[in-house]
Amino acid sequence: MAKVLKIRDLTLRDGQQSSFATRMTQAQVERCLPFYKDAHFFAMEVWGGAVPDSVMRYLNENPWTRLESIKAAVGDVSKLTALSRGRNLFGYAPYTDEIIEGFCRNSIESGLGIMRIFDCLNDVDNVKSTIKYVKKYGGIADCAVCYTVDPKYPKLSLWDKIKGKKNPAPVFTDDYFVSKAKELAALGADMITIKDMSGLIPPQRVSALVKKLKAAVSIPVDFHTHCTPGYGLASVYAAIAAGVDVVDTNCWWFGGGTGAPALELVYLFCQKLGIDLGVNMEAVAKINESLKDIRSELNTSVFGADKPAPKPFNPLVDAVPAEVEAELNRAVKAAQSEDFATLLAAAQAIEAYFGFPAPNKLVQEAEIPGGMYSNMVAQLQALKAEDILPRSMELIPTVRLSAGLPPLVTPTSQIVGAQAVNCALDEKAGRPMYHTKNNQFVNLVKGEYGKTPVAVDPEFRFQICGVREETNYDISKYQQQPNPELPEAGGVKLAENEKEVLLLELFPLVAKPYLTNLKKKAYEATVAATAPKAEDTAAAAEVKQPITGKTVLAPLPG
C-alpha cells in the first residue's frame, strides 16, 4: 500500500458536469481559484468533457479564457487536466491529424498539463494521434481504459442446455483491461486511468484490477469512478488499499451522488492508514466555503430549487461523529482483509450519515449508465410508449452483442439504448427487428467509430448497412467548417485566429452563433468608441452658427 496518494480534483469539470449540468460561470470559478492555488492538488480537471460546449452554449463565455484564467491563478502548483475523446477530441466526429495537432498544441500553450485520452470502444488506434501530439508539445498523456461490464444475458432453460446452447463467453475480463493498458503504455502513455464513468465497478473488482495493472505496467495508475449505483466510495477505499497511485475526488459540496466521492471522506480513511495526500486541507475548507454558496446558486439557476445537500463537515475542525468513526474503523479493517461486503456496507453507512444521495438501485441492478437509462425513458415518454420500457431494457444485451459489444460509455451507450427502444417499438408494431435504425447505430455497425471489442457478423452488417466489410471513417473526406466574413461585424472573419477556428471545427452548431455574437459586439463597441460624443457634436454645431444682424463698418477702438 502506498504511503503517498495523489489527488486529482474534479470539482471544476466532472464535478459540476455530473451534478449541475456544467453551468458554473467564469465568475463562480474565479471565486474559488485563490484557494486552489494553496490546496496543492496533484491535478485539477478543469476542461474538456461538456465544459467548452456549455460555456459557449449557455453562458456565452470563451472556453479558452476558462482554461487560461485557471492557469494564471494556479500557476504550476497543480497540473491542469482535460478530458478528450481520442480522435474525436471534445466533439463527436473523427478529426484529421492537422486539427488534432493544432488542438493539442493550443491546449498545452494555454496551460493544460495532462490530457486524459479515451476512446468509447477502447480502440487503441483511435487515440494514437492524440498521444503523439500531447507528448510532442510537452503534455502528459493520461490514457484511460473505459471500464464496462458484459451484458446480463437471459438464464438458459434446461432444454436450452440439453440442446447445447450457451451464452457468449465474458469479454470484459481483467485480462482484457490489462491488455489494453499494456498497448497504451507501449504507445507512450505516461499514466493509465481505470475510467469507470458509470460507477459500476465494485470494490472487489477494482482491488484485483489495480493489483494486476500495477504488476503489468511501470507507469502510475489512476482510478476514476462515480457514486451513482453506490459503489464509488467503497471502490476508492479498495483501490487505495490495493496500491493505486492517484484517485479522483470532488470537494465536499460537489461530491457523491452522480459525481465522484468526496475528498474529505477519502482523507479520513487515509488518515487511519497513515497515507499522505499532499493536499492542504485548510485551503480545501476555504474552497468549500465558496462552493457551498455556488451550489445553492446553481441549484436555483439550473433546477429552480435547492436540492438536498450533505451535512456540513470540515475534518480539520469538526469532531468525527462516533457512528462515522466506528464505520471508518470497520472500513479500514475490511479493506486490509479484503472483506469487500463489509467494506461496501461501511462506506455506504458513512455516506448515509452525512446525507449524500442513496445508491440508485435501478442503475445498480441493470448495470447500465444512469444517463443511458434516463435517455431511454425520455425517448419513450416523447413517443407516449412508456409501457415498452421493460422490453427495451431486455433488448439491450441483444442489440449490444449484435453491434460488437461496445462499452456502454458516451456516445455508444446512447446509441445502443436508442436502438433498443427502436427494436421494442418495431416488435410492438409487428415489424421485424431493426426495421427502424438510427444513423449512429448504422455507423457503429459499419465500423465508422472504430473496431468493436467483438467482430460484427458480416451478414448482420449487410442487413443494417448494406455492406459486409468493416468500413472505418474516411478522414480524407473531412471538410472544414466554412469561415465566412461577417458584414454585420465590419467584414471580419467568423473565426479570426487558430483557437477560434478550433472552436468552430469542434462545436460548429454552438461556436457559430457564439462567435458571431462576439464579433458583432466587438464591432459595435468599436463603432461606439470612434463615434463623436454628443457634447462634442453640440459644441461644433454652436461654433458653426452663422453670424446674423447688421454689419457695422467702423474702426475698432484702439
Say what each PLM segment does.
Residues D276-K292:
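Phosphate/diphosphate-binding loops
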Residues F35-V55, Q336-T551, P555:
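Terminal or standalone catalytic/regulatory effector modules within metabolic enzymes
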Residues A43, W47-S179, G199-P202:
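Active-site beta->alpha loop and helix N-cap motifs at the rims of alpha/beta catalytic domains
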Residues K161, S179, P229-V244:
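Catalytic cores of alpha/beta
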Residues I117-C120, D196, A242-P261:
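Glycine-rich phosphate-binding active-site loops on the catalytic face of alpha/beta enzymes
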Residues G255-L277:
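C-terminal helical cap(s) of enzyme catalytic domains, especially alpha/beta-barrels
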Residues I7, G15, Y36, I117, ...:
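Conserved, mostly hydrophobic/aromatic
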Residues M1-S19, L67-A72:
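N-terminal amphipathic alpha-helix/helix-capping segment at the start of soluble metabolic enzymes
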